[in-house]
Amino acid sequence: MRIDAISIGKNPPEDVNVIVEVPVGGHPIKYEMDKEAGTLVVDRFLYTPMTYPGNYGFVPHTLSDDGDPIDVLICNTRPLVPGCVINVRPIGVMMMEDNSGQDEKIIAVPSAHLTKRYDKVHDYTDLPEITLKQIEHFFEHYKDLEPGKWVKIFGWKDASMAKQLIREAVERAKTKK
């Protein structure tokens, strides 16, 4: 896969593409895209017997403060094939930090042309409370049994903050080229 050939989206940050690395409900394995080789590699086996609460990946042509493309958790119920590209709408961001530093997670839903299921979801607060608790619980605990690793959740921010973080990550990626 040539990641550089994949568009950031039709109308960023309102509408962005995500390259999926880990499917919802998949085995407790963390995959990451090798950005230079364009191939999916096993990053690590999760020590906790937990599965991702959504499809997980990144927005191409972005760069977060942690040096990786911006992370996205897609709220949907169908597992996507790792390596595929899906068009999404950002609806919020979970603010968190781990042993490597700031590591925010953009929360998104599939774009309306893919499904009408999320038409009324414009902000993370439109999701069921249990969905938000499951996302928080997963990220608070998925590294629990890994020596020297930790995670702290600082709360949630709205869709406008998610879009601002995406804009900043796009600009950061442009200046790093």
Curated annotation (Swiss-Prot):
SUPFAM superfamilies hit by this protein: Inorganic pyrophosphatase
Chief site of localization: cytoplasm
E.C. designation(s): 3.6.1.1
Reactions listed under catalytic activity: diphosphate + H2O = 2 phosphate + H(+)
Gene Ontology molecular functions: inorganic diphosphate phosphatase activity; magnesium ion binding
GO cellular component: cytoplasm
Keywords: Cytoplasm, Hydrolase, Magnesium, Metal-binding
The protein's enzyme class: hydrolase
InterPro entries to which the protein is assigned, alphabetical: Pyrophosphatase, Pyrophosphatase_sf
Localization terms from the record: Cytoplasm
Pfam families per UniProt: Pyrophosphatase (PF00719)
GO terms of biological process kind: phosphate-containing compound metabolic process
PROSITE patterns hit by this protein: PPASE
Residues that bind substrate: 30, 44, 56, 142
Binding positions (Mg(2+) 2): 71
Cofactor(s) it depends on: Mg(2+)
Binding site for Mg(2+) 1: 66, 71, 103
Similarity remark: Belongs to the PPase family.
HAMAP family: Inorganic_PPase
Described purpose of this protein according to its UniProt entry: Catalyzes the hydrolysis of inorganic pyrophosphate (PPi) forming two phosphate ions.
Subunit: Homohexamer.
Protein name: Inorganic pyrophosphatase
Gene: ppa
